[in-house]
């Protein structure tokens, strides 16, 4: 809905348009007990690939990218670190990232996303990782 609203509201613009969609590395990697999340993010990535193709057909089409922002300290992280290892075998990996200080803050992730949005090559790859 937001992508359609953006496209409709800016379709008449002759200047550059960019759309950044927040995805996840889990859209590209399967993980036990996270099927719905992984599938949702994978669908978002593929939607963005299709959207990029649609926009490329237009004279002033928007550049779009579904960006994996890295691992961020969120409520989801808290839930994953507290999950039963019998159903979430990756729990130790997430606990380790927290213990080693490898989780980005939401503010840091937002800053990295904005920096990615301003890269000269933004939109060349419709699905990317901020760590690329």
Segments and roles (model prediction):
Residues 8, 53-57:
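Alpha-helical segment proximal to the catalytic Tyr-Lys
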Residues 30-38, 50:
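Active-site loop-to-helix junction immediately N-terminal to the catalytic Tyr of the SDR YXXXK motif
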